[in-house]
């Protein structure tokens, strides 16, 4: 058994309470202890060990005595306890004295020495520092300038004071009919670089805006915008919207004397920036107007310096870049007269640093005239949003809404022919093969193939190339625009596709919906929806890449099974109007029994071979799929 742990303070208290305490004689120290402090500690430690040994022996003896004398009288036991208690002070007095000396030394020690010891210990745990920089963070998005309580009111009041103006496809005029309203230099540039005839949307806009603009500007150059009001246009793609808003802007700005930022054009993509810039630049030939662009590819510092040194009359940019310039102070909106939103539905769905509120707040800060109608807002889209809350956030003033004379949401060009390819569900896996066969039947075309993702674009292009190598189809020029390519490579592919005029070979560009907006390539003959678009709005933008500028075009829709056919009929076709004398959608694919009864046997004989797969073709097709799988696995490694 182990001895009870010794408590020095308890012994001191017991010795004080004794009536006749014994005189304690401390142990004498040796001379060597007094001379050398270190030797004193050694002897004391040796004495401690001896005393501890004696104590342990005494405890063991006392335990043995207790066991042997368990049957003795109580008086003897009491005498033994008194003797043991009287022996403790003699044994441990030296320990107590040494303990008290240690406490006294600690009180006298310099506090700085203790701190230094702690610092030395902490220094060992210090990690070497590196030259790290703080990660740049985007600016805090400001709250909406519109009170939340007013949002519900705006939803119902967005179209309260809107004047609706209808137009139709028959409204085509000569630009020379507007020679009284258009500057001679501007009219000459239009006829030389664009066309002598107007498109319907151009006709109705020029008829409505030009007389009011010219009259108001002649009366007051400062407040002419109030008589005009804002403009909202819903027009199909390829209908000449860019030229429609460029002509009125240049008609007014061509009369200016000092260059100030008076027109701001906001577009959703960089591709559209270049196309809008080209339109303005061609129209502004022979004038002193300065047209500038701003996009993320350029250095922000260099653009700021350029804008401050030589302020442009017209600036074309994207929402994110615009916010950067507004926050840096390089763009001042004090003299702004025209604000254009091209592809407005996509712009309003984007929230680049809350660009819309940033722009409106900047207008309130910079403009000295805070009255409504201090600028003319022009909103253009092929699928103008029906979300009135988003539109009302732009705070329109006496808006005029220009829409096609139709009860449907959207309108397709008159010369666009649509074909639906009905593919049975059991043959879904052969969809790339059917696409290749369709391409073989189309001669001398330039086709855009739309898929749902970048990965699908990359894999479909690779599989088509492999099938062509295995002689499953004719030789084509097949390229894809996807995220695996660099921006420069994608731009090169698009430019080569646009500039290639070789009509002897089918040119195919596989892409996603990025190419469905803002790509002005007038000679695209065909559009193929390999994956069904998710909405009628997306369908309009895809098909709008062809049949532009009143030219012919074809759109193919690959519909698998009854589900996709029903979706196209109920969610896409129901929202679209077509001209009575224009092209109507037709079925090209495997017909059901009802269609076979209605259609002639001649057309049936033409269609069925497209979807027929013989055993030999099936075997080669499976080899192509295995080759694609091996290629994908190799690229992953």
Curated annotation (Swiss-Prot):
GO terms, molecular function: ATP binding; ATP hydrolysis activity; RNA binding; RNA helicase activity
Boundaries of every Helicase C-terminal domain copy: 434-608
Quaternary structure and partners: Associated with pre-ribosomal particles.
Stretch list, region Disordered: 1-93
GO BP of this protein: maturation of 5.8S rRNA from tricistronic rRNA transcript (SSU-rRNA, 5.8S rRNA, LSU-rRNA); maturation of LSU-rRNA from tricistronic rRNA transcript (SSU-rRNA, 5.8S rRNA, LSU-rRNA)
Positions of the Helicase ATP-binding domain: 222-402
Organism whose genome encodes this protein: Vanderwaltozyma polyspora (strain ATCC 22028 / DSM 70294 / BCRC 21397 / CBS 2163 / NBRC 10782 / NRRL Y-8283 / UCD 57-17) (Kluyveromyces polysporus)
UniProt-listed Pfam families: DEAD, Helicase_C
Gene3D superfamilies: P-loop containing nucleotide triphosphate hydrolases
Reactions it catalyzes: ATP + H2O = ADP + phosphate + H(+)
Function of the protein: ATP-binding RNA helicase involved in the biogenesis of 60S ribosomal subunits and is required for the normal formation of 25S and 5.8S rRNAs.
Protein location: Nucleus, Nucleolus
Enzyme Commission no: 3.6.4.13
Notes on the domains: The Q motif is unique to and characteristic of the DEAD box family of RNA helicases and controls ATP binding and hydrolysis.
Alphabetic keyword roster: ATP-binding, Helicase, Hydrolase, Nucleotide-binding, Nucleus, Ribosome biogenesis, RNA-binding, rRNA processing
GO cellular component: nucleolus; preribosome, large subunit precursor
Biased composition (Acidic residues): 33-84
Positions bound to ATP: 235-242
Similarity field: Belongs to the DEAD box helicase family. DDX51/DBP6 subfamily.
Name recorded for this polypeptide: ATP-dependent RNA helicase DBP6
InterPro entries, A to Z: DEAD/DEAH_box_helicase_dom, Helicase_ATP-bd, Helicase_C-like, P-loop_NTPase, RNA-helicase_DEAD-box_CS
Residue numbers covered by motif Q motif: 198-206
Chief location bin: nucleus
Keyword Calcium: no
SMART domains, sorted: DEXDc, HELICc
Leader peptide range in chain numbering: none
Residues spanned by motif DEAD box: 342-345
């Amino acid at each position: 058994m182990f001895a009870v742990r010794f408590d020095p303070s308890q012994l001191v208290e017991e010795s004080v309470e004794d009536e006749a305490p014994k005189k304690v004689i401390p142990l004498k120290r040796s001379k060597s202890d007094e001379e050398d402090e270190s030797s004193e500690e050694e002897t004391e430690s040796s004495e401690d060990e001896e005393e501890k040994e004696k104590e342990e022996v005494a405890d063991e003896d006392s335990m043995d005595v207790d066991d042997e004398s368990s049957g003795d009288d109580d008086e003897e036991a009491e005498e033994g306890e008194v003797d043991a208690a009287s022996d403790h002070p003699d044994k441990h007095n030296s320990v107590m004295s040494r303990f008290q000396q240690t406490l006294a030394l600690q009180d006298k020690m310099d506090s700085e020495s203790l701190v230094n010891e702690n610092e030395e210990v902490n220094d060992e745990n210090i990690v070497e520092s590196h030259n790290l920089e703080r990660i740049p963070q985007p600016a805090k998005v400001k709250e909406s300038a519109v009170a939340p309580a007013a949002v519900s009111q705006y939803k119902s009041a967005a179209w309260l004071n809107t004047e609706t103006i209808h137009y139709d496809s028959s409204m085509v005029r000569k630009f020379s009919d507007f020679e009284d309203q258009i500057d001679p230099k501007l009219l000459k540039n239009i006829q030389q670089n664009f066309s002598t005839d107007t498109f319907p949307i151009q006709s109705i806009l020029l008829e409505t805006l030009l007389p009011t603009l010219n009259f108001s500007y002649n009366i007051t150059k400062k407040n002419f915008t109030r008589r005009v009001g804002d403009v909202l246009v819903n027009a199909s793609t390829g209908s000449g919207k860019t030229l429609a808003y460029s002509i009125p802007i240049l008609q007014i700005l061509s009369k200016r004397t000092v260059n100030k930022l008076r027109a701001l054009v906001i577009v959703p993509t960089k591709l559209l920036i270049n196309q809008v810039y080209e339109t303005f630049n061609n129209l502004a030939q022979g004038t002193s107007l300065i047209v500038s662009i701003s996009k993320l590819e350029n250095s922000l510092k260099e653009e700021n310096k350029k804008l401050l040194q030589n302020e442009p009359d017209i600036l074309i940019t994207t929402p994110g870049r615009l916010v950067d310039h507004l926050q840096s102070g390089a763009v001042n909106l004090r003299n702004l007269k025209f604000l254009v939103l091209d592809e407005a539905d996509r712009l309003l769905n984007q929230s680049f640093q809350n660009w819309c509120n940033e722009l409106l707040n900047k207008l309130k800060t910079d403009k000295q005239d805070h009255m409504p109608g201090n600028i003319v807002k022009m909103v253009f889209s092929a699928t103008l949003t029906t979300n009135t809350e988003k539109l009302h956030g732009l705070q329109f003033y006496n808006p005029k809404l220009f829409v096609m004379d139709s009860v449907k949401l959207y309108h397709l060009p008159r010369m666009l022919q649509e074909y639906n390819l009905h593919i049975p569900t059991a043959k879904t896996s052969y969809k790339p093969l059917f696409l290749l066969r369709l391409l073989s039947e189309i001669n001398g075309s330039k086709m855009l193939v739309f898929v749902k993702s970048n990965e699908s674009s990359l894999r479909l292009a690779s599989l088509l190339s492999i099938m062509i190598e295995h002689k499953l189809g004719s030789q084509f020029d097949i390229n894809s625009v996807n995220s695996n390519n660099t921006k420069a490579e994608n731009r090169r592919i698009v430019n080569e596709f646009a500039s290639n005029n070789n009509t002897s070979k089918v040119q195919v560009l596989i892409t996603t919906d990025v190419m469905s907006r803002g790509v002005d390539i007038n000679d695209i003959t065909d559009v193929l929806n390999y994956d069904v678009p998710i909405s009628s709005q997306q369908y309009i933008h895809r098909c709008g890449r062809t049949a532009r500028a009143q030219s012919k075009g074809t759109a193919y829709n690959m519909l698998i099974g009854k589900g996709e056919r029903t979706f196209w009929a109920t969610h896409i076709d129901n929202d679209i109007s077509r001209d009575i004398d224009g092209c109507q959608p037709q079925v090209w694919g495997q017909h059901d029994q009802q269609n076979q009864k209605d259609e002639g046997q001649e057309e049936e004989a033409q269609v069925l071979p497209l979807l027929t797969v013989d055993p030999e073709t099936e075997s080669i097709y499976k080899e192509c799929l295995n080759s694609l799988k091996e290629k994908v696995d190799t690229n992953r490694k």
